[in-house]
Amino acid sequence: MTEQASISNHDVAGWRDYLELTKPNVVALMLLTSLIGMLLAVPGMVPIDILILGNLGIALCAGSAAAVNHLVDRKVDLKMARTFNRPIAKGRIDPTKAILFAAILGLAGMAILMVWVNHLTAWLTLASLVGYAFIYTFWLKRATPQNIVIGGLAGAAPPLLGWVAVTGEVHGHALLLVLIIFAWTPPHFWALAVHRKEEYANAKIPMLPVTHGEAYTKIQILLYTFILIAVTLLPYATHMLNELYLLGAVVLGIGFLYYAVAMMRNKNKNAGMDAFKYSIVYLMALFVVMLLDHYLLPTNIVS
């Protein structure tokens, strides 16, 4: 697994390689939260043009940021089994072409948001793109073990972007959705970092388990899980959502707590990966429950 081996690989890039640059699984989760952010913003249905063009613009910008991440991390990716086969790291896509691809996606996404959605959504999306692709990827990721805590704000933006795409303004309820994802990010990524600790250490990425040890990281995961559970109660406490959401948030939160405690007990070497996988299901399910509550038990509070 050397950079020399990667450079000597001259496989022709296919469309799947360019799709992989956009991190489609990550973008899909972001789009779920942006879509639900849109739907929560109004009592009825979102205008179909905003629904389609808003999410398209957000997706293109997210894909652009992901491509920049692939580009910047190409040497790091070679040192990690999880990322060794990425298209730029393996030499299937030339860095220059990757830059052009990222620029086209970003410009297209911004144009769509500016012209057919609204300027506030476009500027907030640009801020999120810059936050992830440049501030996090270029600097924070290599600078501090708190990288994903600080940088997590960019990844937490999609529900706000969706909300603003519909309403044209920032609402407190939209910020609650951001806060939920912001609180979810540390236990989500640190669980993976515990499982992949040796790879991060080999790549010289100062993830928390590398700099402070697994035991300390597991305590932090448990603490952030409690914070996350508390934060997820706020939509009910502020009358944004109702009892159906409260029940779902509590049940899902107990599940997250179970996996955090399982990591603390050190009885399963795959506990970190199990927690990581559950955290993805958790976020998806939580936002779906929000949507069900919104339509089945409308509050008529949102303006």
Curated annotation (Swiss-Prot):
It catalyses: heme b + (2E,6E)-farnesyl diphosphate + H2O = Fe(II)-heme o + diphosphate. Keywords: Cell inner membrane, Cell membrane, Heme biosynthesis, Membrane, Transferase, Transmembrane, Transmembrane helix. Its main location: membrane. CDD domains: PT_UbiA_Cox10. Gene3D superfamilies: UbiA prenyltransferase. One of its GO terms (molecular function) is protoheme IX farnesyltransferase activity. The chain crosses the membrane at residues 26-46, 48-68, 98-118, 120-140, 148-168, 174-194, 221-241, 244-264, 278-298. Converts heme B (protoheme IX) to heme O by substitution of the vinyl group on carbon 2 of heme B porphyrin ring with a hydroxyethyl farnesyl side group. This is Protoheme IX farnesyltransferase. It comes from Saccharophagus degradans (strain 2-40 / ATCC 43961 / DSM 17024). The gene is cyoE.
